[in-house]
Design a protein with these regions (language model features):
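Carbohydrate-recognition beta-sandwich/jelly-roll modules
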Residues: 1-186, 191, 227, 494-522, ...
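Extracytoplasmic/secreted cell-surface and envelope-processing proteins
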Residues: 196-199, 241-243, 344-348, 371-373
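Extracellular glycan-recognition surfaces and repeat-rich motifs
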Residues: 622-653
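Aromatic-lined carbohydrate-binding/catalytic grooves of carbohydrate-active enzymes
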Residues: 146-332
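Aromatic-lined carbohydrate-recognition surfaces of secreted/lumenal glycan-active proteins
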Residues: 187-190, 229-243, 337-340, 357-372
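Glycan-recognition surfaces
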Residues: 242, 246-312, 359-501
Length: 653
């Protein structure tokens, strides 16, 4: 589909092989003099050819193993790109050995892009082909959401303790909404089902009664959507527990093999049977029915009618269910697929099942679901998994998809290599709702503003030019990125440049400019952000505290003054008017304290107080934080001797 030969002296191939190790890039750069091996064939995830005048790439929807969708053939004096093989029936080479009735794949498709100096930097290289490639590549369902989800976190429930009932999670969404002035959120419920995390794995419709049941779960989704928040769940399609209502020996591998065994012994699911029999999809549809009040699966959960060994029928096609999901405003938003080890074809199939129900697809491991996954746990949870299992270590992939997903290498200098201060940052998972023992809300807010808001700001732009340090240049970090340029469709330009002076902590030393104006320097910034109602505001953060002066962005420079609010878990406080002088403002900030600047007085309040749909108003006392005397005992008196009140006292043991 694309080729070059030795008559083109400046020809080069640039491609990507899978690597999630922070110190080993998956990128290959081959020229006639460096790396060219005649009469050989290699397979790659992405591939580009350039010749000094043009640069091009090939896209394919091949479902080949390891997502190596592009084949590069080297002749005696040529390099060419074509699609890797396609599978139409029964999936990959391993799947063909089985006899289940699999769904057929999409019809084969390949596309070619060719560009000149697409980014206008005066050089024609893979950057130009990659920029053109964005117009032909697939985009995962829900990928456009990622750049907005500044508050992405895990909510943990385990072993029947119900430490985070659904409506408490709703209150925490409101608390973070106030503390971040409405920055979008995504909460992933790790333990939404049965008695919590890993209980009754594979039984997706078993929404936990102890955490509030299906009604509270539905109310959580409705409340979350009012506060610009996505709700998703952790599921497992690898293992089944005997306590699951649909557990049966037919669904297990033969011979039976053990899976994870910390609550009860789980057993490995025969994924090909689960796919081919439609049992897995039926279990997912039964969950969809419970959330949305539909009846696409014939079995009624409340009547004890479970999928078992693929009993019951689906009353609509996958496309018909997808059409229903597209119309709903209070459907769940995403699925996180835990411990999934299958290759590309099977992963594409389960992603289709999940996407058809209106749910964005995300995975545990960075190497899974390259075609469809929008978020990876091990790519974002810094210490989790070790240096060898993070996100994709590829400048080419990050160039193409930085704005679409959280599956790249994040900033974690102790792992070295690409993780040592990447210029674009990378979403880092923090929380306060139990996962990993995290319970510190204040620490969560600090890291959200220090690391994750700048990452999300950059993801609102796509990469157009990538410059690394040369071999003869001294780079102050293990990551050799020197300067990255990004743009958006309206013509705004962002430039991220590495600062040579290094801090003593792990935060990234860089300068970010927007249309030539500095908006971030190391750990202080004044970043523009568009609110959910379309209004623009500016977030100010200075980790070290102190005074700093900033040029205001276009649309703000002619103002006489701006209004600055300090942010707290009670929302905006300590209003202050700041004068504008020659298009600049000088801001005095407390250390590690967030501020928001707006063009005039305004408010950001809760639509309904804490405790919405609950039995008690504000059961977590969130509305009293920092109010001191409002918690005096005299304000909380009552008749404890009333016969209707029962007091139970327990001795410490």
């Amino acid at each position: 589909l694309l080729s070059t030969d030795m008559s083109e002296e400046n020809a080069a191939f640039d491609g990507v092989s899978p690597s999630t190790t922070t110190t080993q890039s998956g990128d290959s750069h081959i020229t006639w003099d460096n790396g060219f091996n005649p009469s050989t064939t290699g397979t790659y995830m992405y591939g580009f050819l350039s010749n000094g005048s043009l640069s091009g790439g090939v896209w394919s929807n091949s479902e080949i193993e390891d997502d190596k969708r592009i084949t590069m053939n080297s002749g005696a004096d040529s390099m060419s790109l074509t699609s890797s093989v396609w599978y139409y029936e029964r999936g990959d080479k391993n799947g063909q050995a089985a006899s289940y009735s699999y769904p057929t794949s999409d019809l084969p498709c390949a596309k070619v892009c060719i560009a000149g100096d697409a980014n206008g930097d005066g050089d024609i290289d893979w950057n130009d082909g990659a920029l053109a490639f964005r117009d032909i590549m697939n985009i995962a369902q829900g990928a456009d959401d990622i750049k907005d989800l500044v508050n992405y976190r895990i909510v943990m429930n385990f072993a029947g303790m119900a430490t985070n009932p659904y409506l408490e999670t709703a209150d925490n969404i409101k608390k973070v909404y106030l503390a971040t002035d409405g920055l979008p959120q995504a909460v992933m419920l790790k333990g939404y089902g049965n008695e919590g995390h890993d209980s009754a794995n594979s039984e997706y419709a078993d929404v936990s009664e102890r955490e509030g049941g299906i009604t509270d779960f539905q109310n959580l989704i409705k409340i979350a959507h009012q506060y610009n928040t996505e709700v998703g769940i952790h599921i497992n399609a690898q293992e089944a527990y005997p306590e699951a209502k649909s557990f049966n020996e037919t669904m297990l591998t033969s011979p039976i093999t053990n899976g994870w065994g910390w609550l009860d012994q789980s057993f490995t699911i025969n994924k090909l049977w689960d796919l081919g029999s439609q049992a897995r999809y039926k279990r997912l549809v039964q969950l969809y029915d419970r959330i949305n009040g539909t009846s696409f699966y014939s079995g009624n959960w409340d009547k004890g009618e479970y999928v078992k060994d693929s009993q019951g029928t689906l009353n609509a096609s996958m496309s018909e269910i997808a059409a229903d999901a597209a119309k709903r405003t209070d459907n769940m938003d995403f699925i996180y697929l835990d411990v999934w080890y299958q290759n590309a074809w099977e992963t594409r199939q389960i992603a289709k099942e999940i996407n058809s129900l209106g749910w964005r697809f995300s995975t545990e491991f960075g190497y899974e679901g390259e075609y469809d996954s929008t978020w990876s746990h091990w790519a974002t949870d810094a210490a989790y998994g070790g240096a060898g299992l993070k996100g994709w270590n590829s400048e080419i992939i990050r160039f193409l998809r930085n704005d679409q997903r959280d599956t790249q290498i994040l900033n974690y200098p102790r792992y070295g290599g690409t993780a040592d201060n990447p210029l674009l940052g990378g979403y880092r998972l923090y929380g306060f709702e139990g996962w990993g023992g995290d319970q510190d809300h204040n620490s969560y807010i600090t890291e959200t503003f220090t690391e994750n808001l700048p990452t999300r700001f950059l993801q609102h732009y796509y990469v157009t030019d990538w410059e690394d340090y040369g071999e003869d240049e001294a780079c102050p970090t293990g990551n050799t990125e020197k300067q990255i340029t990004l743009k958006n469709d309206t013509g705004d330009t962002v430039v991220v440049t590495r600062n040579t002076e290094q801090r003593s902590d792990s935060y990234i030393e860089r300068t970010i400019t927007l249309n030539g104006k500095e908006v971030l320097n190391d750990v202080k910034y004044l970043l523009p952000w568009t609110d959910e109602n379309g209004d623009q505001k500016l977030y100010h953060w200075n980790l070290d505290g102190g005074t700093s002066t900033w040029e205001l962005p276009d649309g703000w420079t002619n103002l006489a003054n701006v209004v600055m609010y300090e942010l707290s878990d009670q929302g905006r406080i300590n209003e202050k008017t700041v004068a504008v002088s020659n298009g600049t403002v000088t801001l005095d900030a407390k250390a590690a304290t967030a501020y928001v600047l707006v063009k005039g007085e305004s408010s950001k309040t809760l639509k309904v107080d804490y405790g919405e749909d609950n039995y008690v108003v504000d059961p977590g006392f969130n509305g009293y934080s920092g109010t001191d005397s409002a918690l005096d005992a005299a304000d909380w008196s009552g008749d404890i001797d009333n016969a209707a009140v029962t007091v139970e006292k327990y001795a410490n043991t």
